[in-house]
């Protein structure tokens, strides 16, 4: 039973990466090698499955953040989160839509917020960001990335996201680097 759940989440991660979060869930069940009934027994709706995929991504971000250099933690996290957004267009928008209606989403969102708060506090402590920059400002960057992904040609989306990040980080950081760090997070599965 637990094994089916893990297979479904891994399949959803892969299918969302290939086709976006709005893909028919039949494709997820097929990729996982389970029937629709099994998928819906574990995940009663799309939002519950999206929440599980999001939790895997936040788990991976937390582990990755523990290995990042403290002096550039915020920049690395922003780049990684944007790369995750580009990796599965629509997933973060779906997570926001599920907030408050899907069990577990609020807790995963809280963990993601804590991760950003810690990174931002460290950046403020080191004088790496402009005074007054808040977690809401950083979240606005991710909303802009979602906007870029929604309108950009998929073939150019990653390059456009990198450019958007460069522009916005130059606005947030006190002494922005000449180049952004490269994404390095590898998701399980």
Feature map (PLM): residue ranges:
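Basic, helix-initiating cap at the start of DNA-binding domains
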Residues: 1-31, 48
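Amphipathic alpha-helical segments enriched in hydrophobic/aromatic and basic residues
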Residues: 16, 24-25, 46, 50-57, ...
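Short hydrophobic/aromatic patch on the recognition helix
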Residues: 33-43
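Hydrophobic alpha-helical connector segments
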Residues: 52, 62-88, 100-104, 113-114, ...
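Helical hydrophobic small-molecule/effector-binding pocket
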Residues: 71-96, 106-107, 118, 131, ...
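Short linear capping/connector segments at secondary-structure termini
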Residues: 93-102, 183-186
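All-alpha amphipathic helical-bundle segments outside canonical DNA-binding/catalytic cores
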Residues: 104-108, 125-140, 152, 156-160
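C-terminal peripheral helix-coil segments that are non-catalytic and often amphipathic
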Residues: 114, 118-125, 151-189
